[in-house]
Amino acid sequence: MWTSLAEFTCREPIRRGSQAIAPDGSDFDTPRLRGRLIRGATSGTWSRRPSRVAYDWDLFAEEAALECLLFESHGILDAPWALWLPGPPSVSGIHNLLVHLRFRRPPERWFSHLPADWQSAAALRYIRATARGFGMRVPLPEPTAFEEAESVARWLASARDRAGRAVLKAFASSATRVAEAARQLRIDLRGCLIFAGGESLTPARIAHIRATGATVFARYVATETGWIASACPFGDSPDAMHVFTDRLAVLTAPADSAVDDDAPLLFTTLSAGAGKILLNTDLGDSGRLRRRPCGCPMGHAGLNLQLSGVHSQAKLSIEGITVAVAVITRALDRVVAAAGGPPDSYQLRQEEDGAGARRLVVRLGPALTGVDDGALLRGFFAELPRHGPDAKLAARFWRESSAIAVRRGSPTLSDAHKMRPLTVSGPDHSPRFDVARGRLR
């Protein structure tokens, strides 16, 4: 018994034998949470109608207990810490804030890639006023553009000088930008710890961040499940994480589905606080699982299932924002068609530089010779927000960060002479894998 990504996102009916069920996105909702505290949009959904996920204080209480274990494992319970995560309407920043309010450890600073809209600002003022009544100071999100990573690096160094340790939670690409700013300004980040999530913590990113003196560890969170796993200081690698098996079960799909020894991960929710009810459900991520005893507080609590090498199968993660490949290609198809180009006249390529920073390249084929590169890119950023809240957020992020470029070149074909919708390359631009029909090959 399992639920595929296509079934969970309602792209395909659930077929078992002669039975077929055409689910709606809300069919997977936890009934007791309907209409509860806050809602977030699922990340990288393949469905045309984005699925919404509800959260309440029961979920935050569960996650707060796990966050306490994580901070205790690293010896940072009393260390000053900050967020560099987007504020509302994005759910990532407010989710982390509310979890930490649950155990009375709000961040000292909240750097946000985007300014809050008026509705979100009103909600944040209410949260601040309520927290103040309990003796807690909650910072407002400070708009901090990608090119202003220097501000975050300087805060880390200053907080470290003041308290001996300093902690930052950020997307992996944002953490890389902080490290690059520190490198250019010769800011020593020894004694600083960064929890990086939202994207794969690749070896290049790890090396680039460590070169500043900082330490970095992976975190794994999904909108549908909440907290999934976090890394302690004693793992095999910074991306080797303890799975929070008290609130969900994880196993891998059959071996014949694996790619490069990494199999799709299947999740089953065990907690009544989870926003979605999952039963061996594929969320589109792959990774490696193994049992490993550990002497850290999380290990002593019985969390001895280790997850490493997590990466997205059918989704793109650029600058911490994850969007389905199908959403990007649907938007580009419309823009290319409007410019008079035929189908398959472009190709997507994800590149990673030596510092671990990722960007998306739209490679235009010979059929689009007369199309202006800048006009096509502007058309893409205008079209993408029409494809759901995740796509709208991605358009804002990627435009501001210059994370997308246009180049010229003929598309590459697979060994079977099929068009590769997406190719992925490493720091030397050598190909690693391609995604065809929404699957890794």
State the predicted function of each range.
Residues 172-173, 199:
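Alpha-helix N-cap/helix-start capping motif
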Residues 3-6, 215-223, 339-340:
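Short, well-structured beta-strand/strand-turn elements
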Residues 168, 266, 274-399, 417:
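AMP-binding/adenylate-forming catalytic core of the ANL superfamily
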Residues 251-254, 345-353, 405-409:
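Short amphipathic beta-strand and strand-loop transition segments with alternating hydrophobic
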Residues 88-92, 175-178, 202-204, 225-226, ...:
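Flexible loop/turn segments at secondary-structure boundaries
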Residues 175-190, 208-210:
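Adenylate-forming
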Residues 1-162, 166-169, 183-184, 188-189, ...:
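Nucleotide 5′-phosphate-binding alpha/beta core
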Residues 192, 196-294:
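Conserved AMP-binding/adenylate-forming
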